[in-house]
């Protein structure tokens, strides 16, 4: 054991010699899948050079001896951060789409011919391995919906290795959906076409929106199938196995540090490496020296101060990330500690969603029955997850120090970044005023009261006529009213979800046996259902004309306050024309015209399930330029989808159609 640890220490010391983003790859033997005599030679991908530093710096479990398939058998993986695995081949892999901007990170140009698509399908499905790739699954734990779940790990993803580019950058490649690993538990390690298309498109959409995120380089489907019960309603169906190539500096997450956790007082579960403080030190050394080298350099002689500076920076990055989410209306859906990147990146796209009608209590994940991960709760949950990270870092970071850093940094950094971004979204370019926070809050309240579309309302505000007596004001108000929810949309949104008899029984139980009612954990759900019933009753008594008049009144009040604030901004500018140009430019650069709404993704998925990948590729191109551009007319003409049997066209920048309200995404999505 002493020799083993000494070897690991030497490996880590060698890894530290390579600063962040700098690579010095050495020739690697050709990787081969188990049972394969010789791997096909890549051509387009031949220039990729691997230098798998993580596997040298961190403990790796050697697969146990046994029959074929034993390395992927479900089991605890103690004393290791990775375990060796192999992808399971797919039948007839086919390329769905490539992201050229993501692959450019690896030094790859556009595929030269159709042959390159076949090559991408072969290597990015895991059916063949690139020279130097060393597949491994990462061990981590996590708090899921607030409860410690014990060992989780890469149950459907595999580390391929780290590609070093000619510019000295280093990128970790992952295959998501490449087959079972020891962390797959009772699952099959596969992902399906619908969930893979969603992750592929959203990873790239978020990058082009300017949100910190992991990337997706390719999506490959196949003729292999697995059974999935999408809505957990007893109606399973066969779906195509699909793999996404994911790209990031690292996929290490908060849960990576939870493998050392002792038995949880509530769940009784523990991490697989309890008591292995030596591995926690290794993991901290690796993460900080590799991805926070400036912190390593500044505190090389004081590990506690180094670890404190590291936690402070992770806290700030996480606060900025979730602030960006709130500003583009993004809901993650599964904010468990195992889905939180140690670099402050958005990671693991599952039942995510973008706000359509603004609702601060929107829950995008149908599996989230308590609304724990609602849109408005995301900052609070991220702070909670950081608290769990602080717990996981002790004793290397004393808990009281971690808690003090969290209290000092998170809320302040979130509010600062959020308000800074919101000022840009409102085109406030000249002066910052204390009252700006109240203006933003009132805007969101107005959007909520009128059911306004989040993305389109912000985008429309760039055309708000600043002049008091502008003839365009009436036209602007008319366009703004179009972005408010109609009576039909509101009645659909607030329709009761529970049988009235069941609701009545639950209310009777709450009265007669409050202790039992509390144990059932349905209080939040019942409260939401009562709100829906009350709202539905109010809507039944409201006419369309009354709704329109009410909405106009709400918006007139806020727009008056907004114009007054714009006047103050203009007062600080020397040149009114220059201010107006900058005001509009900043708004166009911060208010997207296109986001990946669920119905846009669903259209692409349904076409792909019929074998037509053109819609996935078209949506991908659309999402690469989400913000306003002068050449937008041609793009807009293409950004439409057939709406119904009559072939009417709906722009992808329009409010979603009514049928989109019926879409449901779960943890299976």
Curated annotation (Swiss-Prot):
ATP binds at residues 153, 155, 176, 188-189, 246, 253, 348. The keyword Nucleotidyltransferase applies. Residues 634-654 are annotated as: Disordered. Mg(2+) binds at residues 339, 348. GO terms for cellular component: chromosome; mitochondrion. Keywords: ATP-binding, Magnesium, Metal-binding, Mitochondrion, Nucleotide-binding, Nucleotidyltransferase, Phosphoprotein, Selenocysteine, Transferase, Transit peptide. The active site is at residue 338. One of its GO terms (molecular function) is ATP binding. It is found in: Mitochondrion. The keyword Repeat does not apply. It is an enzyme of class 2 (transferase). It comes from the Eukaryota. Its main location: mitochondrion. Coiled coil: none annotated. Its EC number is 2.7.7.-, 2.7.7.108. The modification Phosphothreonine is found at residue 635. Changing residue 664 to S: No effect on redox complex formation. The modification Phosphoserine is found at residue 653. HAMAP family: YdiU_SelO. Catalyzes the transfer of adenosine 5'-monophosphate (AMP) to Ser, Thr and Tyr residues of target proteins (AMPylation). May be a redox-active mitochondrial selenoprotein which interacts with a redox target protein. This is Protein adenylyltransferase SelO, mitochondrial. The lineage of its organism: Eukaryota, Metazoa, Chordata, Craniata, Vertebrata.
């Amino acid at each position: 054991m002493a020799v083993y640890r000494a070897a690991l220490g030497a490996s880590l010391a060698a890894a530290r010699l390579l600063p962040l983003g700098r690579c010095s790859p050495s020739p690697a033997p050709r990787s081969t899948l188990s049972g394969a005599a010789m791997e096909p030679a890549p051509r387009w991908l031949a220039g990729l050079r691997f230098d798998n530093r993580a596997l040298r710096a961190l403990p790796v479990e050697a697969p146990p001896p046994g029959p074929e398939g034993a390395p992927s058998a479900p089991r605890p993986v103690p004393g290791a951060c990775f375990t060796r695995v192999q992808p399971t081949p797919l039948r007839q892999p086919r390329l769905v789409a490539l992201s050229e901007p993501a692959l450019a990170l690896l030094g790859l140009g556009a595929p030269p011919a159709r042959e390159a698509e076949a090559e991408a399908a072969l290597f990015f499905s895991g059916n063949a391995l690139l020279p130097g790739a060393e597949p491994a699954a990462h061990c981590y734990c996590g708090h899921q919906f607030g409860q410690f779940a014990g060992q989780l790990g890469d149950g459907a993803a595999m580390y391929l290795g780290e590609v070093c580019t000619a510019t000295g950058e280093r990128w970790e490649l992952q295959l998501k959906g490449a087959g079972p690993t020891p962390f797959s538990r009772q699952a099959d390690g596969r992902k399906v076409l619908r969930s893979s298309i969603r992750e592929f498109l959203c990873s790239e959409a978020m990058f082009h929106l300017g949100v910190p995120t992991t990337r997706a380089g390719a999506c490959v489907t196949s003729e292999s199938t697995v059974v999935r019960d999408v809505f957990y309603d007893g109606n399973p169906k066969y779906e195509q196995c699909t793999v996404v190539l994911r790209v990031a500096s690292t996929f290490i997450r908060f849960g990576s540090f939870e493998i050392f956790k002792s038995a949880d007082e509530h769940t009784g579960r523990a991490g697989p490496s309890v008591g292995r403080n030596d591995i926690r030190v290794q993991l901290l050394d690796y993460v900080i020296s590799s991805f926070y080298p400036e912190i390593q350099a500044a505190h090389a002689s004081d590990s506690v101060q180094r670890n404190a500076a590291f936690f402070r920076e992770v806290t700030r990055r996480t606060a900025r990330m979730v602030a960006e989410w709130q500003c583009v209306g993004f809901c993650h859906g599964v904010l468990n500690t195992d889905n939180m990147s140690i670099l402050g990146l958005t990671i693991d796209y599952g039942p995510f969603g973008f706000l359509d009608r603004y609702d601060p209590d929107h829950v995008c994940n149908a599996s989230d029955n308590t609304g724990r991960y609602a849109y408005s709760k995301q900052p609070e949950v991220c702070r909670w997850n950081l608290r769990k990270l602080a717990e996981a870092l002790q004793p290397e970071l004393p808990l009281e120090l971690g808690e003090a850093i969290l209290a000092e940094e998170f809320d302040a950094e979130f509010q600062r970044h959020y308000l800074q971004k919101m000022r840009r979204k409102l085109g406030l370019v000249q002066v910052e005023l204390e009252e700006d926070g109240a203006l933003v809050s009132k805007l969101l309240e107005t959007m909520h009261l009128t059911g306004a579309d989040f993305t389109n309302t912000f985008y429309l505000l760039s055309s708000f006529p600043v002049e008091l007596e502008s003839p365009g004001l009436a036209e602007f108000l008319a366009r703004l009213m179009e972005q408010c929810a109609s009576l039909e949309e509101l009645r659909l949104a607030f329709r009761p979800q529970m049988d009235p008899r069941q609701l009545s029984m639950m209310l009777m139980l709450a009265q007669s046996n409050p202790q039992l009612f509390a144990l059932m954990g349905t209080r939040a759900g019942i409260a939401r259902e009562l709100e829906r019933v009350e709202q539905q009753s109010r809507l039944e008594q409201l006419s369309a004309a009354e709704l329109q008049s009410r909405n106009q009144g709400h918006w007139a009040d806020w727009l008056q306050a907004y114009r007054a604030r714009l006047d103050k901004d203009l007062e600080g500018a020397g040149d009114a024309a220059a201010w107006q140009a900058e005001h509009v430019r900043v708004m166009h650069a911060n208010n997207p015209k296109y986001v990946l709404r669920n119905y846009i993704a669903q259209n692409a998925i349904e076409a792909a399930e019929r074998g037509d990948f053109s819609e996935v590729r078209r949506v991908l191109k659309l999402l690469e330029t989400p913000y306003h551009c002068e050449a937008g007319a041609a793009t807009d003409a293409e950004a439409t989808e057939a709406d119904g049997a009559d072939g009417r066209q709906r722009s992808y920048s329009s409010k979603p159609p009514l049928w989109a309200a019926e879409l449901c995404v779960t943890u299976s999505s």
